[in-house]
Curated annotation (Swiss-Prot):
It is a multi-pass membrane protein. This is 5-hydroxytryptamine receptor 3A. It is found in: Postsynaptic cell membrane; Cell membrane. It comes from Rattus norvegicus (Rat). Belongs to the ligand-gated ion channel (TC 1.A.9) family. 5-hydroxytryptamine receptor (TC 1.A.9.2) subfamily. HTR3A sub-subfamily. It holds the Pfam family Neur_chan_memb. CDD domains: LGIC_ECD_5-HT3A, LGIC_TM_5-HT3. Residues 393-414 are annotated as: Disordered. Gene3D superfamilies: Neurotransmitter-gated ion-channel ligand-binding domain, Neurotransmitter-gated ion-channel transmembrane domain. SUPFAM superfamilies: Neurotransmitter-gated ion-channel transmembrane pore, Nicotinic receptor ligand binding domain-like. Forms serotonin (5-hydroxytryptamine/5-HT3)-activated cation-selective channel complexes, which when activated cause fast, depolarizing responses in neurons. One of its GO terms (molecular function) is transmitter-gated monoatomic ion channel activity involved in regulation of postsynaptic membrane potential. InterPro entries: 5HT3_rcpt (IPR008132), 5HT3_rcpt_A (IPR008133), LGIC_TM_5-HT3 (IPR049944), Neur_chan_lig-bd (IPR006202), Neur_chan_lig-bd_sf (IPR036734), Neur_channel (IPR006201), Neuro-gated_channel_TM_sf (IPR036719), Neuro_actylchol_rec (IPR038050). Residues 398-407 have a biased composition (Basic and acidic residues). The gene is Htr3a.
Amino acid sequence: MPLCIPQVLLALFLSVLIAQGEGSRRRATQAHSTTQPALLRLSDHLLANYKKGVRPVRDWRKPTLVSIDVIMYAILNVDEKNQVLTTYIWYRQFWTDEFLQWTPEDFDNVTKLSIPTDSIWVPDILINEFVDVGKSPSIPYVYVHHQGEVQNYKPLQLVTACSLDIYNFPFDVQNCSLTFTSWLHTIQDINISLWRTPEEVRSDKSIFINQGEWELLGVFTKFQEFSIETSNSYAEMKFYVVIRRRPLFYAVSLLLPSIFLMVVDIVGFCLPPDSGERVSFKITLLLGYSVFLIIVSDTLPATAIGTPLIGVYFVVCMALLVISLAETIFIVQLVHKQDLQRPVPDWLRHLVLDRIAWLLCLGEQPMAHRPPATFQANKTDDCSAMGNHCSHVGSPQDLEKTSRSRDSPLPPPREASLAVRGLLQELSSIRHSLEKRDEMREVARDWLRVGYVLDRLLFRIYLLAVLAYSITLVTLWSIWHYS
């Protein structure tokens, strides 16, 4: 019995020492917990045993829903030749991480925390149309809410492929798609949804820089599933960026100069058709238009799969100028007939000076209907004229009597008759020359009348062709611009 009392006292003493040690450790722990910041304690609590290589769900059968959102900020470049669109967007991702949840009361009522992106699991959402790495700023943090919702906000410069249709340039509207999808996970693992409503996404232009060449019409969305293999389906969200080019600059620098040159070409028809200045004027105008096309060639978009309609317009305008020059050369050659040119045929005279002149309301064209002067008629007239003159001269005997009565030296009668005949032949030749000159002048006047009527006809046909072509293009461009 005396031996048991010391043992009991020793046991009590040891118990007191152990209790004091545990209390000291508890107080030290509480003091340390009170001095450590809540954010640091929360970060250590969340990332202590976190495995970022595992999809953050407690039930592996449950897919991770990733909600995405896109806000268009700027259209940086549209490369028609390489079919590349460069944009700048604000991209937002939302998903639930079941391993990043806590009770706010345990951590000084902290409801959200920013942690490094490299420390947690992030869905592998990529854009299928990527063709180059843009100069996007790096955002190394994400926001985590106490329910486990992760918010990943980052600006992106996207260099994506786009099928650009430049046929309607400069009144073209482009529709480029941005397809967001998981590169590895099927729809059973990662599903994609839209964070906002499609109407809100389509009409959101709150941060868009609207001072450039392109105008944002809207961003349309579409969700779909696609499968590479029959057993694997993938979720993807498409954003269709619809933009329209502002055509004012191109209308002023491309269309107006071409229109002015065509108007000057039409006004050039007011020059007289028998003037050689019209040909030189048309050639100068054609050379000026060629220089204009060389200058604007770098402004037009170039692709290997198509040509814009405005390029066809320039080619047709060049062809019209060439046709106008050819018509001018034809008319000038027609009204400048040479001396040996045949008279206007009767069928051409009737067709042009009667029918076409009446059709064009040019009034009645005077025509010279004169019978052709034949060599036989001229010969008869010459002989009769010579005969009459010879009858007045008389016979050689009369000439001899007259010479004797006057007592003056005269040439022999035969020589006098030959001189008179030579003089009459010279007069007849002069008369034939004058008649021939008048006939050639009349032929030239006839060809001038024909050329004038044909010039008016070709001018009106040319004017109708230019107006019809211009009205067609203006109508098409107006429909494309306001559709």
